[in-house]
């Protein structure tokens, strides 16, 4: 059996040797550096991927926006074509006159698409032309949407009070005394509506009534502040508005809508053969004259329509090649 040298300490701790300590520290440092580099590379990779996705989304959004703008300009050109061809004669196939009753039209631009709807504002209920006499149309519209009779009276009277110049409220209306009693008080405008958003401040009107809920449409698309008439255009009014006009039955509404589809280049005339025995009643609320103010909803999309871009504009056509925007929302919440 060999003996250990006397100069060798049996209790010597190899882990405390300088050489071993330096090697261990170096190994730990290397591991830390590798870990930090791995985290940095992963973070850079994730950041780069996120930025790439953001750039692609931005690119797609801009392309969709330009497609929607193209649709808007196409709609304006169609309005010019309509104005320069008042008899609405179809010159040849593919050059049909665009109708202004909200029906959709589509177009392609490269690998993208746009869809547009044009509505003549004279086919809607004009809030700035509302009176105690014709307010019944708005009341009927509300009741057809499920609003109770007394609640509909409150809304119609409150809209009239919001516009009139005095501070005396109607039987079911509201003036300053009501609005000043609210938790956040304000005053009745006592002037014409400048935007439809003002309706949210009028007594009785809620988001559910204006915008709809649970599959039930709201009344906002049936209202306007831009029409020059206090009457409703039979040729462009949506079905919901037609059904709200006193004297017009469901049968007459269907007849009008069918005529529009079968003969889009002709107008529904204010004659008894069309409107039945209640012509005199109906005539107090309707017209067959087209206005020069139109709302346009345009959407653009490539591939996935869910990522579409929407624009809503109200345009006044002032001549053969002249127009101006009365309203322009980009993007909008359009459902075109």
Language model: regions and residue ranges:
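Compositionally biased linear targeting/interaction segments
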Residues: 3, 25-336
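Glycine-centered recognition micro-motifs in short, flexible terminal segments and loops
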Residues: 9, 14-32
């Amino acid at each position: 059996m060999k003996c250990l040298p006397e100069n060798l300490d049996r209790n010597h701790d190899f882990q405390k040797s300088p050489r071993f300590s330096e090697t261990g520290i170096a190994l730990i440092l290397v591991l830390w550096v590798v870990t930090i580099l791995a985290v940095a590379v992963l973070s850079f990779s994730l950041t780069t991927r996120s930025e790439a996705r953001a750039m692609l989304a931005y690119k797609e959004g801009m392309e969709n926006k330009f497609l929607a703008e193209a649709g808007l300009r196409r709609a304006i050109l169609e309005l010019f074509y309509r104005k320069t061809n008042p008899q609405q004669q179809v010159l040849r196939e593919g050059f049909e006159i665009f109708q202004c009753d909200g029906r959709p039209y589509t177009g392609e631009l490269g690998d993208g698409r746009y869809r547009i709807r044009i509505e003549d504002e004279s086919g809607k209920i004009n809030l700035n032309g509302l009176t105690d006499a014709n307010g019944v149309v708005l009341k009927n519209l509300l009741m057809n949407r499920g609003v109770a009779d007394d609640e509909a009276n409150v809304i119609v009277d409150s809209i009239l009070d919001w516009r009139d110049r005095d501070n005396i409220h109607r039987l079911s209306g509201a003036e300053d005394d009501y609005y000043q009693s609210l938790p956040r008080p304000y005053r009745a405008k006592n002037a014409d509506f400048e935007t439809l958003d003002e309706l949210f401040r009028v007594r009785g009107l809620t988001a559910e009534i204006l915008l709809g809920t649970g599959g039930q449409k709201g009344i906002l698309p049936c209202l306007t502040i831009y029409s020059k008439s206090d009457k409703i255009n039979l040729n462009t009014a949506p079905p919901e508005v037609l059904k709200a006009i006193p004297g017009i039955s469901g049968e007459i509404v269907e007849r009008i809508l069918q005529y529009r589809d079968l003969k889009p280049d002709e107008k529904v005339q204010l004659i008894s053969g069309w409107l039945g025995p209640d012509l005199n009643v109906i005539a107090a609320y309707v017209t067959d004259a087209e206005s020069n103010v139109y709302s346009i909803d345009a959407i653009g999309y490539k591939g996935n329509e869910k990522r579409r871009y929407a624009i809503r504009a109200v345009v006044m056509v002032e001549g053969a090649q002249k127009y101006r925007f009365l309203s322009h929302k980009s993007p909008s919440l359009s459902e075109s």
